[in-house]
Amino acid sequence: VVGRVRRLTGAAKVGHAGTLDPMATGVLTMALGEATKTVSYLMDGAKAYRFTVRWGEQRDTDDAEGTIVETSDVRPTRDQILAVLGNFIGDIEQVPPVFSAIKIEGKRAYALARADQAPEMKPRTIHIEDLKLLSVVDADHAEFEAVSGKGAYMRSLARDLGTALGTVGHIAQLRRIAVGPFDEKQAISLDKLESLRHSAPLSEHLLPVETVLDDIPALALTEIEARKLRRGQAVPVLPVANRSPFKNIRQDDVVCAMAEGRLVALAKIKGGEIRPFRVMNF
């Protein structure tokens, strides 16, 4: 996807905020040019998914593309499903799928698994902000919606839901419907992007880099202050803060340094100064 977007846009630098599973569809947030400097903020942001669990079959990949390794005749009822959802909300321990991009001693877990050297995956703490049952499609399938933090796997969630319900299960369908402030309404398909390059400026379909940083306080700079930050120099925070509606900025806070409505730099408040650590070269 990165290569195709680079070719279609002509951008020298292209980044993305989190991979999608091979069988997954939905939102993949792309950053072009200087916006790649903000990708880490999207990576740490919330992601929303809609997925269908197929009960009664466990697969080695925890999705429909894998080989069946265990079956069960148990099919949970709607009430049983609703009763366990609360156990999966908040900070929970989750074992990632063996077929994942996590590195184990320098090698991807999926590469080891394909070479019949499946590694032991260690549990890690992840955060599930919300988990809802949308519908019981039939005895074998249930549809869910989840909002998660960084590092959560819906395939593992489906597997663990099955275990909690006394059966087994895997992801039959998976769609990412939002990443941070971006959702499907703002998304554009690769095919449409291909067609637009011949008919309209792509810039009309790009969102400003500030969209990613909408939850970070913004400080308005004068042109002199902006020039200093662009050169990597710090500026005193007090005059800037006095012009800002944000009166509770603290030591080590990250701020967006702005000039004339454009992002100049991401900066930290240190020792009474605004110190840039990501300067934008627009």
Map each language-model feature to its residues.
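RNA pseudouridine synthases
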Residues: V1-S156, D160-I188, K192, L266-A267
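Accessory RNA 3′-end/elbow-binding domains used by RNA modification enzymes
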Residues: V1-H16, L20, L85, A164-F282
